[in-house]
Amino acid sequence: MSVDRESLRETAKYLQNVRPVDPEEVYEYLPSQPHPAVVRRALREEAFSLGFREREDGSFVPISEDPVDQPGWEPTQYPPQYDRAVADRLVERYGRDWETGESGHRLRERIRELKETYYRGEQASYDEEAALAYAIYHGADFYAATGYALDPLTERGLLPRRLRVLDVGAGTGSPAVALHDYLPEDAVVDYHAVEPSANADVLEAVLAETGRNFRTTIHRTTAEAFDPGSVG
């Protein structure tokens, strides 16, 4: 059953000034009274444009207009949930002891090849094995560096709680999840990754660990073929 989006938006805009927007209530005001679960899905899709965030109880409230405060970014490791997402793909391809034996040797060799390619300023190409090697080599340092790059924005009050991000050449996702973890829980992000290589498979697994208000879309195409206007 579909939802009349115009009626949904009008109802949500009215209720936001009164109380949290609850799909269990909103459906009663809509034509054909669609199931609350359908209304919730539609609200999630409309949340960014409405300026809403979803709470743990499934209701929606306006996003604060206050800029993001400095979170005191000092990571000591790549968070376990993202590390596991990469490790699961390694186990799927090579088995539980992926870091030893022939598979471990091949991964280390691919890392050395990637480093040599970077050093020469050449363009790297990524098949599945290279993507996994890339994730192993760059995961932690790219994660940490991204947060430090955001600090100057928060120092100046320039990082809003509602963000639309276009990440061209998104790689295996460390910068994306660093942004997710850097932001407060009441932030809302519409994140679009442009990644044509096998890195996108690792990226998809890592992004699956992000929260409900970090909406993600992966565009598996080249930067040249991608239309930035398509993301709104």
Regions found by a protein language model. Name each.
Residues E24-S32, V38-G121:
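N-terminal auxiliary segments of SAM/dcSAM-dependent transferases
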Residues L153, G157, L183, L207-T210:
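Active-site catalytic pocket residues across diverse enzymes, especially alpha/beta-hydrolases
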Residues P160-G171:
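Conserved class I S-adenosyl-L-methionine
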Residues G121-R156:
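Class I SAM-dependent methyltransferase Rossmann-like catalytic core
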Residues D201-S230:
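S-adenosyl-L-methionine
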